[in-house]
Amino acid sequence: VGGSTQALITLAGYVGGAALLLAATLPALPARTIAVIPVALVLNIVIGQVVGAVGLPLYLDSVGTVLVAALAGPVAGLATGTLSSVVWGLLNPAALPFAAVAGATGWLAGWFIRAGAFRTIWRLVVSGLLLGLICGALAAPVAAFVYGGTAGVGTGAIVSLFRELGNSLIGSVTMQSFISDPLDKLAVLAIALAAVKALPKRTLRSLRPGGEEQAAGAPEERAVGVR
């Protein structure tokens, strides 16, 4: 599967999309936001590598992305997710084709959080599940056509189980994604919420869109949808 025409087309489409996303978003970000992106990249890569080595049927490789999205908005989340996969791809080429999906994760997470995902537990749960379903649908073609459904150890085992039950490759990968991704994104949102609550209010105020100029008249917690 890895060298097939389908794989090459899928790879080119997603990598090309990632390049366009970076070109459109990075120049628009303020310096204070760009300064925290490297920290988010390290979080994504380190946590993702550890979880992948353990063999859990999750990823947890978007914690940094969602945290930036919570602090600085959807566009910053999009740039962080995309750049994370590009940088990670230098160490682990398997991450590169997922760059556009990672960018979409950051962008969608930013909008879910802005809409109030962090305000109550039930909103967090619903947002995490919806985010996971959307991201799972986006990632399934990459995992299926580029990697044959074996992009991860733990997730690959679930794909193999569905294959043994007689399902097609794309069907097996999609079902695996609809199991793993909602749980993964729910966990990621919960971790990001805990991190946001632990940060000083001055940090929240300085990183939110508009920065210090909009500090007056709005509580810092509202910048990330926290009550």
Predicted regions and their residues:
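Hydrophobic transmembrane alpha-helices
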Residues: 1-67
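Membrane-embedded alpha-helical hairpins and interfacial helices in multi-pass inner-membrane proteins
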Residues: 1-15, 53-55, 95-97, 117-227
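Structural signal for the C-terminal ends of transmembrane alpha-helices
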Residues: 19-28, 111-116, 195-203
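Generic transmembrane alpha-helix motif of multi-pass integral membrane proteins
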Residues: 21-23, 61-77, 108-112
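Membrane-helix interface "capping/anchor" motifs
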Residues: 25-33, 68-80, 117-119
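Hydrophobic alpha-helical transmembrane segments
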Residues: 34-39, 63, 78-82, 96-103, ...
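Interfacial aromatic-anchored transmembrane helix boundaries in multi-pass membrane proteins
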Residues: 45-60, 81-122
